[in-house]
């Protein structure tokens, strides 16, 4: 109610290892609270590392999404690592096309995980450059307007 009284939308991020960690749980929570001021911050990587596909997650969650960010990953939960976009094999083209098919028109941004930031050789400028190049190429190859 506090957010609604100020016209603020809150975005919850389903997260691997958390109690809200799959499409069913976040959709149940949204249904229980039933507020137009509660949406999803959709990070597909948290679904990918537990084996939930783009085709399963995107159609369910994109209609309730107010923001999304992406990063790469390697491995499967519990033995996984988040990576800089472009360091892994995530299919950004397929993801962008799936988001577009749902009518999502909001922001899609890159996230650099704390796992990456803790690397002794972490370079934020190199991470930003790789992220930009990776996502820019993906948008172009997907035929999705960056708006």
Where are these regions (language model features)?
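Short, flexible helix/strand-to-coil boundary loops that buttress conserved ligand/catalytic motifs
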Residues: 34, 62, 139
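Active-site acidic/histidine proton-transfer and metal-coordination neighborhood
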Residues: 1-40, 49, 142-146
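Gly/Pro-rich active-site loop or hairpin
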Residues: 19, 23-27, 31, 46-105, ...
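Generic helix-packing signal
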Residues: 7, 30, 61, 132-135
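Hydrophobic faces of well-ordered beta-strands that scaffold small-molecule active sites
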Residues: 10-12, 38-42, 66-70, 106-112
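C-terminal helical cap(s) of enzyme catalytic domains, especially alpha/beta-barrels
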Residues: 120-146
